[in-house]
């Protein structure tokens, strides 16, 4: 369960980071 949670958190963080980077560009 923890592994899935961490994996989901990392995936969400990457998505948010990409979105911010895309918006800044």
From Swiss-Prot:
Compartments it resides in: Secreted
Keywords: Amidation, Antibiotic, Antimicrobial, Cytolysis, Hemolysis, Secreted
GO biological process terms held by the UniProt record: defense response; defense response to Gram-negative bacterium; defense response to Gram-positive bacterium; hemolysis in another organism
Residues that span the membrane, as ranges: none
Modified residues (Histidine amide): 25
Coiled-coil ranges (or none): none
Domain of life of the organism encoding this protein: Eukaryota
Expression by tissue: Gill.
Entry GO CC: extracellular region
Function: Has hemolytic activity against human red blood cells. Seems to disrupt the membranes by adopting an alpha helical conformation. May play a significant role in innate host defense.
Family label: Belongs to the pleurocidin family.
Protein name: Chrysophsin-2
């Amino acid at each position: 369960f923890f592994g899935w949670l961490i994996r989901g958190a990392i995936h969400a963080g990457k998505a948010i980071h990409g979105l911010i980077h895309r918006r800044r560009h």
